[in-house]
Amino acid sequence: PMHAFDSRKVEKIRIKRFGTPFTFQTLDGVERNIDENTLMICNDNTPVAIAGIMGGLDSEIVDDTHTLTLESATFNAVSIRKSTVRLAHRTDASMRYEKCLDPEMTVPAIARFVKLMTDVDKDVKVVSSLTDEYAFHYDTVELDFDKAFVDKYTGIEIDNDTIIST
């Protein structure tokens, strides 16, 4: 999942937990009680979204929004699930994050979003660089591979280049 913010209200994204509880109004207009364990997306130190759950009303995209700040991220599935339960607020985004999304897909997701936007409007421009804060890396795993087994299992012979590229 990605979240788009009005760039006039979100210039620099930071992810953090606050040391004290506070209330936060989400996009659905509900005031939510945020505790010290809830991960928040912030514009510097101002909360703008509950990480992996829902954006905030104060940074939503409105009719006169012309520039966006995009956030494409993965979060710890257990952390998101715990926040969802504490807040009693399960969303489409939180359900996806609870399934341990592949962190390698965040950058391609933004590229896909930009492509779809330019397909709709050729005047769309990317005006900033991409920042990739990658806190978690999967270990590389090497597997023994038997091409004959793949050919037998699929019932067709697949050339090596196709196998390597997929």
Language-model regions: role of each:
Residues 1-166:
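RNA/tRNA-interacting regions in translation and RNA-turnover enzymes
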